[in-house]
């Protein structure tokens, strides 16, 4: 069986790893083994954080909606409850955008939600205090 010489392939692979690891700090950008380890970690972090980003944006939208809702004397929880009761299907991303860019429209949505809410949520059903 013929001997396999891997010089070209090995150098090509090392060169591509070192090229991808430019910008890393210290040995991680210069030594192949350190660069390879760092690249594995970097790709894992990128994969994980692409998924985490979705939750972070949702938290941001909720914080913005809550801040705008409290300016209209209603809590985020009651606003969402009222919008669902009124049958308004606006997702949190668009609701946050409306809250920032068009406060008058957001106030109109708050009024719709307030009208759809029952008078006293804490009272037993059928008895308004």
Swiss-Prot record:
GO cellular component: ribonucleoprotein complex; ribosome
Gene3D superfamilies reported for this sequence: 6.10.160.10, Ribosomal protein L20
Biological process terms in GO annotation: ribosomal large subunit assembly; translation
Keywords from the named record: Ribonucleoprotein, Ribosomal protein, RNA-binding, rRNA-binding
Any single Pfam family the record assigns to this protein: Ribosomal_L20
GO molecular function: rRNA binding; structural constituent of ribosome
Keyword Ribonucleoprotein in record: yes
CDD domains found in the cross-reference section: Ribosomal_L20
Summary of the function given for this chain in its UniProt record: Binds directly to 23S ribosomal RNA and is necessary for the in vitro assembly process of the 50S ribosomal subunit. It is not involved in the protein synthesizing functions of that subunit.
Family listed: Belongs to the bacterial ribosomal protein bL20 family.
PANTHER family: 39S RIBOSOMAL PROTEIN L20
UniProt cross-references to HAMAP family, sorted A to Z: Ribosomal_bL20
Protein name: Large ribosomal subunit protein bL20
Protein's organism: Mycobacterium tuberculosis (strain ATCC 25177 / H37Ra)
Gene: rplT
